[in-house]
């Protein structure tokens, strides 16, 4: 009996280098994690473009932090540096920053984008706020 094979062997897909000089950095900073996504000037992933417009991304968990260490400003700094380095490989030089969320890594992530060599054009706070919408969760009792 011939040995079983597991289907066709896939070739690793080659990542093509995009040449984008201007982009957007979306920093989502929650109480538990910080996620930095760097996109092209048209913004984040759209429904019409399934591949999306994300050039690079990194989170505190992806960089190597676990548990409560993901919520620290240092973890946000490392995540922003990692995302910026990957974006610079695609030729990115200038970003407009959009910050969302109440987390502790907001300012640190912006500073580390600048320190990594990206020029920050503008900073906008796009944190969603409810206009008396859903009822908030009950108060914590510790």
UniProtKB/Swiss-Prot annotation:
Stretches for region Disordered: 1-21
Pfam families: Ribosomal_S11
GO molecular function annotation: rRNA binding; structural constituent of ribosome
Residue ranges, compositional bias (Basic residues): 7-17
GO CC annotations, alphabetized: ribonucleoprotein complex; ribosome
Keywords for this protein: Ribonucleoprotein, Ribosomal protein, RNA-binding, rRNA-binding
Matching InterPro entries: Ribosomal_uS11, Ribosomal_uS11_bac-type, Ribosomal_uS11_CS, Ribosomal_uS11_sf
GO biological process, one term: translation
Keyword rRNA-binding: yes
Family: Belongs to the universal ribosomal protein uS11 family.
The protein's assembly and partners: Part of the 30S ribosomal subunit. Interacts with proteins S7 and S18. Binds to IF-3.
Protein purpose: Located on the platform of the 30S subunit, it bridges several disparate RNA helices of the 16S rRNA. Forms part of the Shine-Dalgarno cleft in the 70S ribosome.
The protein's name: Small ribosomal subunit protein uS11
């Amino acid at each position: 009996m011939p040995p079983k094979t597991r289907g066709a062997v896939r070739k690793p897909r080659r990542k093509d280098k995009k040449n984008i000089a201007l982009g957007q950095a979306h920093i989502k900073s929650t109480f538990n994690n910080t996620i930095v996504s760097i996109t092209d000037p048209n913004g984040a992933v759209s429904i019409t473009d399934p591949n999306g417009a994300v050039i690079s991304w990194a989170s505190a968990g992806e960089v190597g932090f676990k548990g409560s260490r993901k919520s620290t400003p240092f973890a946000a700094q490392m995540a922003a540096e990692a995302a910026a380095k990957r974006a610079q490989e695609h030729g990115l030089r200038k970003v407009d920053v959009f910050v969302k969320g109440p987390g502790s890594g907001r300012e640190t992530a912006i500073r580390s984008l600048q320190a990594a060599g990206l020029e920050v054009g503008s900073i906008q706070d796009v944190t969603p706020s409810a206009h008396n919408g859903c009822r908030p969760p009950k108060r914590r009792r510790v």
